[in-house]
Amino acid sequence: MLQTSKGSNSSSTSSSRSASISTATPNTIVEDEELLCGPKSELTPPAVANPLRPVSKSNTSVEDDSKPSFTYDLDVFNLCKEYLNTRNHHGLALIARQKGIPPILRFKVWPILLKSHPFVISPFIQPDSELLNESTSSRSNSSSSSSTGSNTPLSTAPGSIKDAAIIDGDANDNDNDSNSNSNDDDNDRDNNDANTKEKEEDEQNNKIREKIKRDLAKYIQRLKYSQSKYTVSETEHEILSILENAIMKFTLKWGKIIKYDSSLTWIALNLAEWFPPIPKTPWVLVGKEYSSSHQSLIVNFLDDYSNYIDNIPDLREYLERLIYHDEKISTISFREVYERLVLVLLHCPQPVSRRKKSDNQGQNQRRNQSEVQKDQQSFKVNKTTLPKTGGTIEERVSYFIYCLRKLIPELSQYFHEEQILTKFGCLDDEWLIWWLKFCGTKVWSKYDRGRIWDFMLGWRLKNPKRDFNYYYEKLNYVNRNTLEKLGPDIFWSVGNEEEDISGDNNVDANANEINNTEKTETGKLVKREGDIKRSSFKDLVNELSNELHISKRVSTDEVATSTSSPATTKMASSSSTSSTLTPNVSIPFSRVDPHVALIFISLSLLKSKENILVELDQHEIRQFLSRLPSKSYKYNQKRSTRQKRISYASNASSTSNSPMGQSPVDRDEDSIFPTSRIVISNDSKDQKHKVNFIDNIISEAGELWRKWLWSEMVEDN
């Protein structure tokens, strides 16, 4: 827990870098956390003169095996740099949701994405039930007191003595003196009430600040569990002070909607693992992946990716300019980034009653509580609207359990036998809240969480009023081949490319007729004029495909001079009107709500750990899911693992009758891992360190989404 002076409560980032912080002592951690240490173990502050040097005394103390895996297509990386230099949030959002932002650029990209995020522009956070009840009771008390005051006799109402004297017309000097004394008494009473209220607020704020300090100290204790005593350095103290002030200011601003919870501190801590809290420095928190014997709580974020940086000429110089000299791209403070990130992670759709009220502002009558609950119940079970609109945390948890039973029945049955999800809401099952409500905060690996947050921060829907040319211009007319490398939306559904082509004005009626016939014969679900009986899930598929996908036809000459994707090539060659149905350029947009997508990502993570989970008991499972290790495997096993995946995908596509089991690209090795791509890797030369494949987890989440959608459509028929 940090010791801060009373005047630092409202201090800014600049004020937190005062002389008082530079004289940090072992007293910066309190005894009740058992983290006190003697001066002998006090850390040497990181050298400021050479901030790119690792905090550790030598590079040899950190093995290559501890470096995270990172491979990234060079063309996409250069495109990301181009969009960053021009602050192009359209292009950065596209890369973020499709491939993820390079970790070494997140500290500049995330602020740009957050500034333009729909959930920041139109924020809505689900209010805490306790605060909601307090607000309702206070309004009712205020209403009753006002009605009581209106029925009070005039002579006893505040300020009524003067009015009564004027009405009576017989007021004398004594009456005036009495009136003056009464007004003075009223003013004194109001001042006393205001002072009392201010003191209560100060006491409440002090309690919140103490909770924040205690949670920050728990983070240190969690990382340094093998050390009974630990002292923070000057730089660490400054970083933790910035975090404390950011959390406190957010709580003061949004305290009437949500009360302080430890999750707010953990969001700040996890943000500080990628975004340096101190401006113009590379220092970030290390995260739980580092050994408890690591000398410091902070690390230079460039050190983890030194192999990748050294493989690209002039990249290190470019990053140093971004860190120390940038005044144009992004200079936003940690506090502002933190507030916007919380608005995205904790966002939920407005209740039905609130949406209707905003649409009909002239109607002032409130719906009673039973009607609102009825609407929420109907929305809770409406699986055709939840994927698009999202829902409250209660609705998402119910949806998660439903999908778990449907998509991973064996694991679901084991969870049922072990009673893993039967005590939802208790401390035993709080891992699920951290997964779904707080988007992996605290419980996931920083590397997995960073990639998933990339996906959520890059979430964008297509504006139906904008055409292809508008977005293509916003992307600065990106090269077709580079755009193809980004691939389709992860949560794609059937009928997107084909429907766009069949609906194009350049295609004649015969081509449309042939196209529709082919779709029907192959099981592709397409809206036809003659259909009478239609499934609600078919409507959902068509709605997702038509509204959230945008593409434009490419002429035959352009196709001849450019490389087509496997999906569009296969589609064009299979059609009898290939001369007309030429491949198209696609700009993928988000299709499902990001928090619903997070549900399928969570299911994919559980599926990847299934073999481990079935070997554990109740307590071990909950502990494991509360500190989920990074999904990784040895680099020298990558080849065999890849072959297994390809074999499994091939068998699944040949045995499955579901058209959703087929990917928009061919499932051969060359299409999954094209040899023509220039991919720069952070891998060590000995190829023995672990490789993170969270991208595969996210891709598997898309497969689970299509599997769920297909099964629901079959049952709906």
From Swiss-Prot:
Presence of keyword Transmembrane helix: no
Region (Disordered): 1-66, 132-209, 353-377, 503-522, 555-583, 636-670
Keywords: Cytoplasm
Main location: cytoplasm
Low complexity bias locations: 1-25, 132-155, 504-515, 560-582, 647-658
Signal peptide: none
Extent of Basic residues compositional bias: 636-645
Descriptive protein name: Oxidant-induced cell-cycle arrest protein 5
Organism annotation: Candida albicans (strain WO-1)
Organism taxonomic ancestry: Eukaryota, Fungi, Dikarya, Ascomycota, Saccharomycotina
